[in-house]
């Protein structure tokens, strides 16, 4: 399992992201691949050296103008795992068995990709998948409080959806 995280000079959020993976994840057979994109802050590079002392973490360097797809693709190419999690650097792990849950869904023959529910710091939903209709695509359950089960309790259910977001 490889966790690919793009980054550019966002040390506070990157540190929180990486620390949450290392400290909270119960699955332990993973690597973290940080894809560096034109950072300029000395502290960022010092952190890369510090965190790379952990054998589960390494950095690769993307040299070129910002292009989210190319940055992610370089991280995936460098990844050694059978599966890849594409994770924004401002993400914090809150569920210890998140990797196991995703891998369990990936094992299904009818699944091509798996997404997770993302929350804003105020505990409202940022993303819970994308629903696609003939003339519209929409983020589901956006801005609902975590405690709101939603229509037919769909906010609390694992669902088969058409798309999962990944934003720059």
Language-model regions: role of each:
Residues 91-135:
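Conserved donor NDP-sugar-binding/catalytic core segment of glycosyltransferases
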Residues 1-4, 31:
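Cell-envelope/extracellular polymer assembly enzymes that use nucleotide-activated donors
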Residues 29-38, 60-62:
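Short beta-strand/loop segment that forms part of the nucleotide-sugar
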Residues 84:
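Short aromatic/hydrophobic "clamp" motif used to bind/position activated sugar donors
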Residues 67-70, 77, 131-168:
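A recurrent flexible, glycine/aromatic-enriched loop bordering the glycosyltransferase active site
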Residues 19-29:
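Short, acidic, metal-binding catalytic loop of nucleotide-sugar glycosyltransferases
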Residues 36-47, 64, 92:
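A conserved acidic beta->alpha catalytic loop
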Residues 48-70, 78:
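Conserved donor nucleotide-binding strand/loop of the catalytic core
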